Design a protein with these regions (language model features):
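Terminal RNA-binding accessory module
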Residues: 5-9, 383-475
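Radical SAM enzyme [4Fe-4S]-AdoMet core and its adjacent flexible, acidic
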Residues: 48, 244-261, 265, 312, ...
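Conserved SAM/AdoMet-binding glycine-rich loop
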Residues: 110-115, 124, 227-350, 361
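Short flexible coil/turn linkers enriched for glycine and charged/polar residues
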Residues: 181-184, 194-196, 293, 303, ...
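Proteins enriched for Cys/Gly/acidic motifs involved in redox and nucleic-acid/cofactor modification
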Residues: 1-243, 282, 297, 319-330, ...
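Active-site proximal loops enriched in glycine and acidic residues that flank catalytic Cys/His/Asp
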Residues: 237, 273, 301-303, 339-343, ...
Length: 475
């Protein structure tokens, strides 16, 4: 169902102005309490790139409230964890980290502990924190992030715990202050939420339904990023291929890519994530025709067996998926494809798992993100019968990884001797070496001075190491 032009899912400017007033109030309170010392915040982000982008906005609000940042929670006045709900492992890690903060709180009662993000949108998690973690001060979900200044002010001024995990389809908050972690790589969210309801996935329940940002705003932000010297812009959405479907009269994702590609400047465009059922020939043709769009496609297949794909509610067959890859490579022979795979979905047999092994051999992925199925409470898959043991699934997982290693080794070995345009990103672990990425999103390390960081250089591949490359400057 299309949103009507009159439906308002954007946070009103009056509300944003109100939150800016709370930023000032927090600044005043802390300035008095700390005798003029600048308060420090420790921010830790779990999960996906969308969470990283959200944290940049939360850090922007913190800066507006007068905060600086520290890498050590012991030195901080507040500690903020932006959480992930996708896998059980993230939940275990979070509570392990939160428990460690209790000692800091005991030494410094004014130290504030804040939990936010996807995991906090789950009612059972909020209840667990309320009952078992009384030293946590503020909890808010994904739909209340723009109200962070108000929530912090309430906690500071009353000394009481503050919880805000309202359930809604979500909103879009534009024009929030932003603290970017990089000066040359930028995350640019184009939409939020998801309408797909894959049976194993909690995201639609914690992120809400799909909400596309205005293309005018996105293009304007991209233009400003290029003007500011950014060399890589990654467009973010749970399913970028659905962009515009919820806004009457809005352009689709392929058209948005073309518009950003037409911005003058030397930069590359990446995007994630694409859902195979919505990945069209139009989009693949657009990727091929737009010289600034990186020839890298992350296209999560999740499984290679049709019965399991149907149980996952993925909306495509293995044959349709492979046909899509065949077309993609016909228009982009240099395309690098990566994917996600879940091993041991409830009811999956070993024979069905072998269909996934066969699929990756046909797909020839550059790399894979593989996970053993992790049930998430509230999803349909969590209620499905799951007779295969974790130990047995672990054996399947190892078999899949071994098969992918051979594929990746062959693909990277074929790159030796060739030259690639690389964005130089950071110092490598080895002294005198720089780490960068090819357009195909493969890490390559090479000897160079730190002055090249943030620039494009041509690098010749001299050695392949399965998941990464070594090289030398060729320009």
């Amino acid at each position: 169902m299309l949103l009507s032009k009159d439906r308002n899912i954007v946070v009103p400017q009056e509300e944003l102005d109100r939150q800016m007033e709370f930023c000032g109030l927090v600044h005043t309170v802390l300035e008095t309490r700390l005798d003029g010392r600048r308060p420090l915040a420790y921010v830790h982000t779990f999960g996906c790139q969308g969470n990283v982008a959200d944290s940049e906005r939360l850090k922007g609000l913190l800066e507006k409230m007068g905060f600086g940042f520290t890498e050590e929670p012991e030195n901080a006045d507040i500690s903020l964890f932006n959480t992930c709900a996708v896998r059980e492992h993230a939940e275990d890690r979070l509570f392990g980290n939160v428990g460690a903060l209790k000692k800091i709180k005991e030494k410094n009662p004014d130290f504030k502990i804040i939990l936010c993000g996807c995991m906090m949108q789950q009612e059972r998690i909020a209840e667990k924190i309320q009952k078992s973690y009384p030293f946590v001060d503020i909890v808010f979900g994904t739909h209340a992030a723009h109200k962070f200044p108000e929530l912090l002010y309430r906690a500071l001024s009353t000394g009481k715990r503050v919880f805000d995990i309202e359930n809604s389809d979500g909103v879009i908050a534009e024009d929030l202050p932003l603290h970017r972690d990089s000066t040359f790589k930028a995350w640019l969210p184009i939409m939020y939420g998801c309408n797909n309801f894959c049976t194993y996935c909690i995201v639609p329940y914690v992120r809400g339904r799909e909400r596309s940002r205005s293309s005018d705003i996105i293009i304007s932000e991209a233009r400003e990023l290029v003007r500011s010297g950014y060399k890589e812009i990654t467009l973010l959405g749970q399913n970028v291929n659905s962009y515009g479907n919820d806004r009457e009269g809005e352009m689709n994702f392929a058209s948005l890519l073309r518009e950003i590609n037409n911005i003058d400047g030397d930069f590359i465009i990446r995007f994630m994530t694409s859902h195979p059922k919505d990945c069209t020939h139009e989009l693949l043709d657009t990727m091929a025709q737009c010289e600034k769009v990186a020839k890298h496609l992350h296209l999560p297949v999740q499984c290679g067996n049709d019965r399991v794909l149907k149980a996952m509610n993925r909306g495509y067959t293995a044959e349709k998926y492979l046909s899509l890859l065949e077309y993609a490579r016909s228009v982009m022979p240099e395309l690098s494809v990566t994917s996600d795979i879940i091993v041991g979905f409830p009811g999956e047999t070993y024979e069905e798992f072998l269909d996934t092994v066969k699929l990756i051999e046909k797909a020839q992925y550059t790399s894979l993100y593989t996970f053993i199925f992790s049930p998430r409470e509230g999803t349909r898959a969590a209620k499905m019968d799951d007779p295969v043991s974790r130990e047995e699934k672990g054996k399947w997982f190892s078999e899949l990884c071994a098969a992918q290693e051979k594929i990746a080794a062959a693909r990277t070995s074929a790159m030796v001797g060739r030259e690639y345009r690389v964005l130089c990103e950071s110092k490598a672990k080895k002294d005198g070496y720089i780490s960068g990425r090819t357009q195909g999103n493969i890490i390559i390390e090479f000897p160079a001075d730190e002055s090249v960081i943030g620039s494009f250089r041509t690098v010749r591949v001299t050695e392949a190491l399965i998941w990464m490359l070594k090289g030398e400057l060729a320009d």
